Each structure stands twice: as structure tokens, then as C-alpha cells.
Curated annotation (Swiss-Prot):
Its main location: plastid. It comes from Piper cenocladum (Ant piper). Pheophytin a binds at Q131, N144. PSII is composed of 1 copy each of membrane proteins PsbA, PsbB, PsbC, PsbD, PsbE, PsbF, PsbH, PsbI, PsbJ, PsbK, PsbL, PsbM, PsbT, PsbX, PsbY, PsbZ, Psb30/Ycf12, at least 3 peripheral proteins of the oxygen-evolving complex and a large number of cofactors. It forms dimeric complexes. InterPro entries: D1/D2 (IPR055266), Photo_II_D1/D2_sf (IPR036854), Photo_RC_L/M (IPR000484), Photo_RC_L/M_CS (IPR055265), PSII_PsbD/D2 (IPR005868). The modification N-acetylthreonine is found at T2. HAMAP family: PSII_PsbD_D2 (MF_01383). It is a multi-pass membrane protein. Keywords: Acetylation, Chlorophyll, Chloroplast, Chromophore, Electron transport, Iron, Magnesium, Membrane, Metal-binding, Oxidoreductase, Phosphoprotein, Photosynthesis, Photosystem II, Plastid, Thylakoid, Transmembrane, Transmembrane helix, Transport. One of its GO terms (molecular function) is electron transporter, transferring electrons within the cyclic electron transport pathway of photosynthesis activity. This is Photosystem II D2 protein.
């Protein structure tokens, strides 16, 4: 005979953590999760700050530029601009010594840029944690979150680590389309970025991933099992079928004939499709960290010396070096007004059209 002592309840008493856990992760249709406590507020503030800045806030006091819809910019030319170089690496808190609680002054000083950059970084981290949390909840492997580390690495290296290595937030990209293009030209002129091997690996990763994606999608479409009499993909197979929807064997034979080699199992194929772009993004991020420290790569000095001595000797490299000098000369004076740079007209390189 068994005697049970104690109070019997249908459900064990829940402590505060369990109540919160249920509220965040189970009692709703759209998953929030503990990661959502970081993701949603930070994403809201980052996007809200960007929309506010591009709509109303000028860059006259930091860059001498118009940068808002209010001043006549459009979607491509509006931006949330970086603070002035004189503010160095200040966090530019609204209540800090620079703005002293004055919201208008805070916007004029570029406070919205640090606001958007830092909240944006934590929002991206929150999104990666969301993928970890949801994967763990449904017992998936965490490769989605691992893959998303690539974009996070690029964002953090470009918007945070690079300016931290330079003299201030001023040299980070402003948050806008044309502003990012200007930053790319700046990277080329001042760092010769396109000849950096880490940039090359990044390009290979991103373009290689696009190629793999196109090949994979086309191959699956080409080798679908036909389950109906429909004329196109969306009618010729049943979306709820339990069986495999395409023939890996047929795909393998096809690419073996095309290239001579082909993936023989899906796990290796899909891991490769994960590995290529993520590795490319991480390599780019490492390269930008190097630029933050002003490391140089691939300076072919022997060609530069020979080109200087022999007017008839020229390579694509020496032409690009001259182009970079032109970018620096034209950009520096207008891009860094705080330096008060003045170049004599005769030293500014000009094309035939000018």
C-alpha cells in the first residue's frame, strides 16, 4: 500500500521565471522569446532614429551638407550623418556633456548616428539570439544563427571597429544610400580596398554564393518529380507530398557530365552553400579591422618606382594608384572640411572632359 502525503494539484506551482518564460515563448502566436527583450526595443529605436534623422535632421553642422527630406533630399541622398571629427569617439549621450539634454542640439551634433549605430548593432545581435533561441525550442541545429554572424561581423567592423581605429566616428559611413557609396570611394582612395586580399575573398564569397544559389535552384527545378498533369512547377507536383520532391541522382549525373565533378550528397552540398557566403563575409570583416589599424596590402612598390622612372611603363596597378591619388585629392578638401585643406588648382588631377 502506498500513502502519498502533501497537496495534490493539477499543475506544479510556477515561479516568476516560469510565468515570464511562458508569457514570452508560449502564450502567443508570434514568437517573442527572451531574445525579443533585446531585439524589439533596439530595432524599434534604430529604425525610428533613422527615419527621424533622414526626415528632419540636417548635417550642416557636422559635414556642411543637406541630408534630410526636409531640406530637399530624396531616398537615395538622405542620410543620418556621422558626428563631427572634433567629437572623436564620444558616445554622444543625450544627457552627456555635449548636448546637455538639449534634443535639438543633440541632433545637430550627430547624436542620432551613435544612437542608430549602437541600437542597430544590438538589434542584429538580438536577431541572431532569436534564431538560437527558437532553434533550441524546436530542437533544430543552430546553423541559421551561425550564418547570420556574417552580416553582424560586417556591420560591426565597418560601422564600429573601423571608426574606433581612426580618429573618430566621423570616418564611419553615414546611414544612407549615397553616403555608403561615398564611403566605398573613400575606402578605395585612402586604403586601396579593391586590391586587398580580404576584399577579394569577400567578393568571391558573395558572388560565389549567388552562383551556387542560382545553380541549386535551377537544378532542383530541373529535376522535380512530376506528380500531376499541370503545365508548370506550381501545378505539376503536390506541395504536401511525403516523398522527396526532386531527384538528387539525376542532378548528380547531369553536373557530372557538365563539369566532370558534382556533389554526391545533399548534406555536403548545403553545407558548402552555407560555408561560401559566411566565410566571405567574415573575411571582409577581418579586412576592415585591418584597415581600422591602417594596415596596407599589395603595395607593388617596384612597379611604382619603375613607372616613375620610365614614362612608357604603365600597368593597371600604377593607373589605379594614380586614380587613388585623384580620389584623395578631390575628396579630402570637401569631405574633411574641419582640416581646411586647400590644394592649388594645378595639383588636382583632371580628366580630358574637365
Amino acid at each position: 500500500m502506498t500513502i502519498a502525503l502533501g497537496r495534490f494539484t493539477k499543475e506544479e506551482e510556477k515561479d516568476l521565471f516560469d510565468i515570464m518564460d511562458d508569457w514570452l515563448r508560449r502564450d502567443r502566436f508570434v514568437f517573442v522569446g527572451w531574445s525579443g527583450l533585446l531585439l524589439f526595443p533596439c530595432a524599434y529605436f534604430a529604425l525610428g532614429g533613422w527615419f527621424t534623422g533622414t526626415t528632419f535632421v540636417t548635417s550642416w553642422y557636422t559635414h556642411g551638407l543637406a541630408s534630410s527630406y526636409l531640406e530637399g533630399c530624396n531616398f537615395l541622398t538622405a542620410a543620418v550623418s556621422t558626428p563631427a571629427n572634433s567629437l572623436a569617439h564620444s558616445l554622444l549621450l543625450l544627457w552627456g556633456p555635449e548636448a546637455q539634454g538639449d534634443f535639438t542640439r543633440w541632433c545637430q551634433l550627430g547624436g542620432l548616428w551613435t544612437f542608430v549605430a549602437l541600437h542597430g548593432a544590438f538589434a542584429l545581435i538580438g536577431f541572431m539570439l532569436r534564431q538560437f533561441e527558437l532553434a533550441r525550442s524546436v530542437q533544430l541545429r543552430p546553423y541559421n544563427a551561425i550564418a547570420f554572424s556574417g552580416p553582424i561581423a560586417v556591420f560591426v567592423s565597418v560601422f564600429l571597429i573601423y571608426p574606433l581605429g581612426q580618429s573618430g566616428w566621423f570616418f564611419a559611413p553615414s546611414f544612407g544610400v549615397a553616403a555608403i557609396f561615398r564611403f566605398i570611394l573613400f575606402f578605395q582612395g585612402f586604403h586601396n580596398w579593391t586590391l586587398n586580399p580580404f576584399h577579394m575573398m569577400g567578393v568571391a564569397g558573395v558572388l560565389g554564393a549567388a552562383l551556387l544559389c542560382a545553380i541549386h535552384g535551377a537544378t532542383v527545378e530541373n529535376t522535380l518529380f512530376e506528380d500531376g498533369d499541370g503545365a508548370n512547377t506550381f501545378r505539376a507536383f503536390n506541395p504536401t507530398q511525403a516523398e522527396e520532391t526532386y531527384s538528387m541522382v539525376t542532378a548528380n549525373r547531369f553536373w557530372s557530365q557538365i563539369f566532370g565533378v558534382a556533389f554526391s550528397n545533399k548534406r555536403w552540398l548545403h553545407f558548402f552553400m552555407l560555408f561560401v557566403p559566411v566565410t566571405g563575409l567574415w573575411m571582409s570583416a577581418l579586412g576592415v579591422v585591418g584597415l581600422a589599424l591602417n594596415l596596407r596590402a599589395y603595395d607593388f612598390v617596384s612597379q611604382e618606382i619603375r613607372a616613375a622612372e620610365d614614362p612608357e611603363f604603365e600597368t593597371f596597378y600604377t593607373k589605379n594608384i594614380l586614380l587613388n591619388e585623384g580620389i584623395r585629392a578631390w575628396m579630402a578638401a570637401q569631405d574633411q572640411p574641419h582640416e581646411n585643406l586647400v590644394f592649388p588648382e594645378e595639383v588636382l588631377p583632371r580628366g580630358n572632359a574637365l
